[in-house]
Structure formats: structure tokens, C-alpha cells
Amino acid sequence: MSDPRYQIDVSVVTRYLKDQSDPENDRFAFAYTITVQNNGTVKAKLMSRHWLITNGDGEVEEVRGAGVIGQQPLIEPGQSHTYSSGAVISTRVGTMQGSYQMFAEDGKRFDATIAPFRLAVPGALH
């Protein structure tokens, strides 16, 4: 969205969870920590999420739900909300991308884009 009042930036850090993975059974677990930064000028509440999780074979799982980890945080301008969650995929490499549906205090509904990010077992990519 180009309107500077509704500027939400999303950053992601991922981590492979070796202890929760079972490669022989095509189970690869990852944790991710997301920071949702309100760089706009109005308060915005994160209402819901939409994820597209793609494994290395191109299979896509779509996930929708209210809030994030049971919360619908209200994020003040200049503030951020950070949370951690996880995903399990059936290949050593995959991607996640999506959006958060936001509701600004002035009544405007808008989407905050989550750019694609990689899930990868260490050493799986050269």
C-alpha cells in the first residue's frame, strides 16, 4: 500500500529445528520469529493472517486464521509486535509468504504483505 499512514513492515528470522525434525519420514520443522513494525501514522490492529507455505516439490498449503498465536495486537505508530511460531514441511527446503489483514483506528482495512522467505535445512542450499 502506498499511503504512508498505513505502512506496516514485516521482518522474519528462521531457524531449523533439528530436534523436532525426522528426515527419514520427510518431516522438517522450522521456527520463525516475526516482527511487525508500524511505520505508519495511525494505530493498526492485526486482525488475521494468510499464509502460503510451499515445499520444495511445489506443493502449497494455505493457512488462514485470526490474529497471530492467539493474539490480535494493536500496534502504535513507531512500535512493533514480535512473536515466534513454527511450520513443518515435507522437504529440506521451502518458502512461506502471505499477508496480515490490518484494521486501522480510523476505520481503514488494509493488508500488510509478508514477502517470501526461505525455510531451509542448513547445508541444503549451496
UniProtKB/Swiss-Prot annotation:
Residues 2-126 form the ApaG domain. Signal peptide: none annotated. One of its GO terms (biological process) is error-free translesion synthesis. It comes from the Bacteria. InterPro entries: ApaG_domain, ApaG_sf, Uncharacterised_ApaG. NCBIfam families: PRK05461.1. PANTHER family: F-BOX ONLY PROTEIN 3, POLYMERASE DELTA-INTERACTING PROTEIN 2. This is Protein ApaG.
